[in-house]
Design a protein with these regions (language model features):
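N-terminal pre-Walker A segment at the start of P-loop NTPase domains
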Residues: 1-14
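Phosphate-binding glycine-rich loops of NTP-binding sites
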Residues: 21-61, 110, 217, 287-293, ...
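Conserved P-loop NTP-binding catalytic core
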Residues: 39-106
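Electropositive, glycine-dotted interaction segments
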Residues: 89-241
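Extended helical coiled-coil dimerization/tether regions that scaffold
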Residues: 212-277
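GG-anchored amphipathic helix commonly corresponding to the ABC/SMC/Rad50 NBD signature/C-loop
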Residues: 261-263, 268-271, 277-307, 317-320, ...
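C-terminal lobe/lid and adjacent interdomain/linker elements of RecA-like ASCE P-loop ATPase modules
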Residues: 320-395
């Protein structure tokens, strides 16, 4: 679980220090910065995918300038610190990305450590063999770092000036602490099922072998469902039964591979016709993806599940079901979501709500406190307090 996060200089987030709980629901006006917070986890995901992917993602997203608070003229770097707690221990990972030539980023600092152990590791380059090559290395506690694999004793400063995270290499060849942190960093899953256009991957055929995890845009939903049906029939049936609550005419999925590919199809009650994604409403497709995501077998769940406006296109009753599923899945994985739905907000406790507001161009994040609202909650729901601007989060 991600226990704490600090961010500086990322989009509208000039400076943020935030403790996180099993459920974290961001509410606020349009443009307040909710989606910027959510997009930070997508940024981290690309940063940890494989060498070259961070710069590819930055380039596709408009360049490094577009990620910096008020642009590179005002902000020169992005800084972040993440603190994790898991069954393997408590860990810390931090990095600093500096604006560089050609509208790109370079790492000016990157470090990690075990919070329960006084000795700390530091990210170092793969295949480094000379202190002259990498003159800036130190531990979190500023003590000398003994690089046993390199047989070097270094007392210099931090390593800097590289374009991709060194944690990618150390996640497979470094210390156990490095491996654990890399796995935690890789296990953020950000999902947004907004694209239901004619060219959306959700509506196309996909490989039957692309079934390990549900894709960010549910582009492999059919293959993922087929894998659950074959290996986890009990969970598959729960998915089908829940979709029937949202779409009463839904009977079952028709998951028939053809040439090692598969298309999302289903039948309805009272007919033998087979329906395809192009015949369904946007809300129905999103409901299928959300229910599958939230009811998948626990072993395939990510450590941190991130959702951006999951209520989009859903009937009010469907929103309440999704809220219940989020509460249930939070017992097995951490959930971070942004929403504009009063109905969804009412599915959660006050301490799970984070109000996001924009003041002087920067986003602020404030978690609600139950004790401060006890008198109000005797007469009003959370959504009513939101609409009345008692808790903030309105334009």
């Amino acid at each position: 679980m991600l226990k704490h996060i600090s961010i500086k200089g990322f989009k509208s987030i000039r400076e943020l220090d935030l403790d996180l709980s099993p459920i974290n629901v961001l509410i606020g006006a349009n443009g307040s910065g909710k989606s910027n917070f959510i997009s930070f986890f997508k940024f981290l995901h690309w940063m940890m995918r494989s060498p070259g992917q961070l710069q590819f993602f930055v380039g596709q997203s408009g360049g490094a300038n577009s990620f910096l608070f008020d642009g590179a003229v005002f902000t020169k770097k992005i800084q972040s610190n993440l603190q994790f707690e898991s069954t393997s221990g408590q860990y810390n990972y931090s990095f600093e990305l500096a604006y560089a030539a050609s509208d790109t980023f370079i790492f000016s600092e990157e470090k990690f450590g075990d919070l329960l152990n006084s000795s700390s590791d530091h990210v170092v380059p793969k295949n480094s063999s000379s202190i002259d090559e990498y003159p800036n290395i130190q531990q979190l506690d500023n003590s000398p770092l003994n690089l046993r694999t390199l047989n070097l004793n270094l007392t210099k400063e931090r390593i800097s000036g590289y374009r991709e995270s060194r944690l990618i290499d150390l996640g497979t060849s470094g210390s156990q602490v490095a491996r654990n942190i890399f796995l935690l960093m890789q296990n953020f899953a950000s999902h947004q099922f907004h694209d239901t256009s004619q060219t959306a991957r959700l509506k196309q055929r996909c490989s039957i072998y692309d079934n390990q995890n549900l894709k960010e845009d549910a582009g492999n939903l059919a293959a993922f469902l087929l894998q659950i049906r074959v290996y986890h029939p009990r969970y598959y049936q729960r998915i089908v039964d829940t979709i029937r609550q949202i779409a009463p005419l839904f009977a079952d999925f028709v998951l028939e591979p053809m040439n090692n590919t598969i298309l999302l199809q289903w039948r309805e009650i009272g007919t033998d016709l087979v329906f395809s994604p192009h015949q369904a409403s946007d809300g129905t497709l999103r409901a299928m993806a959300l229910v599958t995501l939230l009811l998948q077998p626990p072993d395939s769940l990510p450590d941190v599940l991130i959702l951006d406006e999951p209520e989009l296109g859903l009937h009010p009753y469907a929103i309440s079901i999704i809220g219940s599923l989020i509460n249930s899945v939070s017992n097995r994985c951490q959930v971070i979501l942004a929403t504009q739905s009063p109905l969804l907000v009412d599915c959660f406790e006050p301490e799970e709500i984070i109000v996001v507001e924009r003041n002087n161009r920067e986003s602020s994040f404030k978690r609600l406190v139950q004790a401060d609202l006890e008198d109000w909650l005797e007469e009003y729901s959370l959504s009513e307090l939101w609409n009345k601007n008692v808790i903030g989060g309105r334009p």
